């Protein structure tokens, strides 16, 4: 008996044009996973846990970016179904963590091989990150990615110029508890789940060339390629700055206070993953 499947897509995410969506639907059909309902963000509201339970949904397929995946999955904490996250956005950090560099069609084609897994999340008072939270003026690079996806060349140039200025001259963020890295801080601190701890990577730059390389790494969709210090794994981290700390939570912007504490916590939704991938 076929399971009840719902599909969430974001047509403004990544390269989700109609042809791409039709190819995905065909792949789902071949895998006997034809969705009973398709929800298109932002036109349709995201379903909550009670809506999925009332409809008997057993599998929720997400073909969208990290921000949409975050918004869709976090309210489902404790739901008894399974979620399949496919790469349908700009960076696709969560999909890459679960499936590597496989395409959405390849992941669906190998559905029978996927294994259920649980991950942790990085918690903050401004929202939880399933993939990462970036703290510091380097968080403004999220606007460059937005301009890259939706804007004109002029908007991209303006966003890039502003991000470089903010990263090079904005208030640094230090790691106060536990005390880690450079006392003067960094323009970007990346906190991401690693098992039952927070892995801390601090991105600094001593010259304009370093900033340029870091910006290029972000635009190339892999923040981790930028020059950085690896500062270990911790259950909790307190960041401090002389000004409000800019945040990027799974690609979405937020503004914190001068001190922000981050903790690790289990995430109570079962995700399907490639059997060879490390799970956080």
Which ranges hold each PLM region?
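ATP/NTP phosphate-donor binding region
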Residues: 1-63, 70, 74, 78, ...
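Hydrophobic beta-strand segments of well-ordered beta-sheets in folded domains
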Residues: 2-7, 36, 83, 171-172, ...
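Short, solvent-exposed amphipathic alpha-helical segments in soluble enzyme
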Residues: 22-26, 77-78, 146-147, 215-220, ...
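Glycine-rich nucleotide phosphate-binding loop and flanking beta-alpha elements
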Residues: 67-69, 245
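Catalytic core of DAGKc-family lipid kinases
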Residues: 77-199
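ATP/nucleoside-binding phosphotransfer catalytic cores, i.e., glycine-rich phosphate-binding loops
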Residues: 204-280
């Amino acid at each position: 008996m076929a399971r009840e499947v719902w599909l969430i897509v974001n047509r403004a995410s990544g390269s989700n044009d109609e042809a791409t969506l039709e190819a995905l639907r065909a792949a789902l059909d071949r895998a006997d996973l034809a969705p009973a309902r398709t929800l298109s963000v932002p036109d349709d509201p995201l379903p909550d846990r009670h809506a999925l339970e009332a409809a008997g949904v057993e599998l929720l397929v997400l073909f969208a970016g990290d921000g949409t995946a975050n918004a869709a999955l976090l309210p489902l904490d404790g739901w008894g179904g399974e979620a399949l996250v496919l790469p349908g956005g700009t960076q696709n950090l969560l999909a890459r963590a679960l499936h590597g560099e496989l395409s959405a069609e390849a992941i669906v084609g190998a559905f029978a091989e996927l294994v259920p897994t649980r991950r942790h999340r990085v918690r903050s008072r401004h929202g939880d990150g399933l993939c990462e939270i970036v703290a510091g003026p380097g968080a403004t690079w999220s606007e460059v990615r937005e301009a890259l996806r939706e804007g004109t060349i002029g908007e991209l140039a303006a966003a890039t110029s502003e991000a470089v200025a903010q990263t090079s001259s904005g208030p640094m963020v230090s790691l106060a508890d536990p005390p880690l890295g450079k006392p003067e801080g960094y323009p970007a601190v990346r906190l991401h789940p690693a098992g039952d701890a927070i892995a801390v990577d601090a991105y600094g730059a001593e010259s304009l060339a370093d900033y340029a390389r870091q910006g290029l790494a972000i635009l190339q969709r892999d923040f981790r390629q930028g020059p950085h210090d690896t500062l270990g794994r911790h259950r909790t981290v307190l960041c401090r700055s002389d000004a409000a700390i800019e945040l990027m939570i799974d690609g979405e912007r937020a503004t914190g206070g001068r001190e922000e504490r981050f903790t690790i916590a289990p995430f109570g939704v079962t995700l399907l993953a490639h059997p060879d991938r490390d799970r956080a």
